[in-house]
Amino acid sequence: MEQHIVESLNLDDYLFRSYSEGERVVTLYIGYYYTADKVGAAHSPLVCFPGQGWEISTPKAASVTTAGSRVSAEQIMIRKGQQRELILYWFQAYDRTSPGTLKQKLNNFWAKLRSKPEDNAFVRVSVTIQGNHVEDAAKSAETFIQAFYPAFFDYVTNQQSS
């Protein structure tokens, strides 16, 4: 990402990468923060996408069950011209996920009470919607999260306090 974006988001670290299988492409973005002071530094896609000219659907709650965990997320569809994407996103505070920053703050406080690291993150999984195949895009996002999240969870929960 461009340096001014990294600075604007006050990121400590990030990952922005696309993965493909056949014609399906899944894009993963993780904005990572080392301290609780930065909880809320990441903002919801409901803020940034309209500012970039995207139309967004009404968010709906989403839940993805993975090996040993459940990811509580928000799902939206965005459109700009003919391009449409399905997005699942959540905020991570130690071992808990939430679709919004208020619950992220509560989860981070709970982690602190348990003497866990203050690391937190914003995670976004995007899949281009091809034709009218919204369900296919949603399934691709869910399958990706099921494969990706256990490794991410392990990374987040095994960090030493910063």
Locate the predicted segments by residue.
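Solvent-exposed beta-strand/loop surfaces of large extracellular or lumenal domains
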Residues: M1-S8
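A cross-kingdom signal targeting lumenal/periplasmic-facing segments of multi-pass membrane
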Residues: N10-Q160
